[in-house]
Amino acid sequence: RTPLPTATHEPTRTALPTRTATTTLSPPFVLDKQIQVCNPNLNEPQIQIFLNDGAGLGVPGVQIILTWDDGQESIFTGLKPDIDLGYADFVMTPEIVYTLQVSGGGQIISDLFAPECEDEGSGRYWGSWRLIFKHP
């Protein structure tokens, strides 16, 4: 009798593990400019916030947290696209001091309060702040 041929086994290839993408936390927004706004046409004192990306375009949907002695409020950019996609504003109560932080560990801006402005025609009134943040 003739022996049956023995099967030779080819070595099987073991797939290399696939690399999983690691998310890199992007750096937080940093304050680029803080401008006092004295405009008698604004009916109430505001904190006007602009968040821009590296190309200078507004970034919508970013949470901004404002705190004061007995309160806190969150606002979001992008709700007033007619002004700018990266724009948000908050109405200040005169003589209250606010602290602002862009979510995600951004720079803390403290001691924000309605500045006093004066206009020859309309006298004294409460001013506003314009804060422009950039994403490095």
What is each of the regions a protein language model found here?
Residues E44-Q46, G61-Q63, V97-T99:
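Exposed beta-strand and adjacent loop surfaces of beta-rich binding modules
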Residues F50, I65, Q101-S103:
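Residue-level recognition of well-ordered beta-strand positions that form the cores
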Residues G56-E73:
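Short, ordered, surface-exposed loop/turn motifs in non-cytosolic proteins
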